[in-house]
């Protein structure tokens, strides 16, 4: 599991299956009989064409106009062609945001070459943005509020 747990809710289904929902600052999980499943909601899906730029390193620049992502968010790519030996059809954490139209993800191995605008056509599924790792509460005008 990614992140710092923020809340938890346990229940038992009518068939006796035990569930536990755990929300972290980064993801939302459901634990069923000891197995954790990532059920973090998707905030947006974008159809992209040739969005990847490689430079023979593990950093891949992704171009997506008005992506709305921030550092630490998660994106899942699907239906793209391999680019410079990299399979981009999986989930990545966004490691930096260049601007409102581009961000960087880091792969586990280096690209075998340098390509500007590759990968063919596919989808980018953006999960809801992450929250702060640290938070505190305070009494403000008689009401408890998260800061």
PLM region spans:
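N-terminal beta-propeller domains
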Residues: 1-45, 128
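Hydrophobic beta-strand segments of well-ordered beta-sheets in folded domains
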Residues: 19, 146-147
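Small/polar beta-strand repeat architecture
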Residues: 39-146
């Amino acid at each position: 599991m990614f992140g710092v747990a923020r809340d938890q809710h346990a229940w038992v289904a009518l068939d006796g299956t035990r569930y536990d929902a755990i929300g972290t600052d980064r993801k939302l999980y459901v634990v069923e009989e000891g197995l954790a499943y990532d059920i973090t909601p998707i905030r947006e899906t974008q159809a992209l064409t040739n969005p990847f730029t490689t430079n023979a390193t593990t950093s891949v620049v992704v171009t997506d106009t008005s992506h709305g992502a921030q550092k630490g968010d998660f994106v899942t790519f699907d239906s793209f062609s391999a680019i410079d030996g990299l399979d981009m059809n999986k989930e990545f954490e966004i490691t930096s945001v260049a601007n409102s139209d581009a961000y960087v993800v880091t792969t586990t191995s280096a690209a075998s070459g340098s390509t500007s605008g590759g990968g063919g056509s596919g989808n980018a599924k953006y999960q809801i943005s992450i929250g702060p790792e640290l938070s505190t509460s305070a009494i403000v005008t008689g009401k408890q509020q998260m800061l």
